């Protein structure tokens, strides 16, 4: 006979799972976008928490005497979920950085666009790259890895078992930030090389024919050359996305390891 009993202790345990999951969904790539309806976020968090609750074995460590102690446990679970989602979301920020470099080189940085995902003013190419990488994140099934990592975190880090190691988390952030600029330049390296070659050609022409207004001509040629290079290198985006997703996996694993 199936037992459907549900006590107050089960509710407290379920709420702790829900807090970690909802905080992860709030900041995770694609699901944490501002234009994602709040009902969708809550629904995903709620049903994911139900599945995890039915799968996990309640830990005996969830013991507290006062409301303040329970509030501290809730806060720890919230921070754990935010850190796991932040580890994945920070890797997608590299895409916006790469788009800003491309626009700065091609001259499109003068034209900005309101990003509906973040409600911030950003570069046109940055928005294009961001949505391209988001679509590939869904098409490649990378979102399943993120939710799988979240589910595994409850095994590695039980509820009320979060222990923050500041040195490990700081080291993970430092290692990633050292590669942040390098990853961004790898994405836009073809465009950067084309514009660099064009600048060299314009510099030679300016010396050969000083009467020509190379500034006016160069602005138009940079935009045309940049868009052409961007179009020709579109086939390289899946490879760049795979590289970013590998970095995303490393960050999520390192952040989970910093809370064990």
Language model feature labels by segment:
Residues 1-260:
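Hydrophobic alpha-helical segments and their helix-loop boundaries in membrane
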């Amino acid at each position: 006979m199936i037992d459907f009993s549900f006590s107050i202790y089960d509710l407290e345990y379920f709420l702790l799972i829900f807090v970690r999951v909802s905080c992860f969904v709030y900041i995770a790539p694609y699901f944490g976008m501002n234009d994602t309806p709040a009902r969708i976020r809550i629904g995903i968090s709620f049903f994911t928490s139900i599945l995890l609750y039915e799968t996990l074995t309640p830990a005996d460590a969830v013991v507290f005497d006062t409301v303040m102690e329970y509030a501290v446990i809730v806060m720890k679970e919230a921070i754990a979920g935010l850190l796991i989602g932040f580890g994945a979301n920070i890797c997608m920020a590299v895409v916006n950085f790469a788009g800003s470099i491309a626009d700065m080189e091609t001259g499109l940085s003068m034209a900005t666009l309101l990003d509906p995902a973040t409600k911030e003013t950003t570069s046109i190419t940055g928005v294009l790259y961001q949505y391209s990488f988001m679509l590939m994140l869904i098409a490649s099934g990378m979102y399943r890895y993120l939710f799988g990592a979240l589910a595994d975190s409850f095994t590695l880090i039980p509820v009320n078992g979060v222990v923050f190691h500041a040195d490990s988390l700081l080291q993970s952030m430092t290692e990633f930030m050292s590669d942040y600029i390098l990853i961004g330049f790898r994405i836009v390296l073809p465009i950067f090389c084309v514009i660099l070659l064009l600048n060299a050609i314009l510099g030679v022409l300016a010396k050969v024919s000083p009467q020509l207004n190379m500034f006016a001509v160069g602005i138009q040629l940079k935009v045309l050359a940049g868009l052409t290079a961007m179009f020709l290198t579109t086939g390289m985006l899946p490879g760049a996305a795979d590289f970013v997703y590998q970095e995303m996996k490393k960050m999520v694993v390192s952040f989970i390891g910093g809370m064990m």
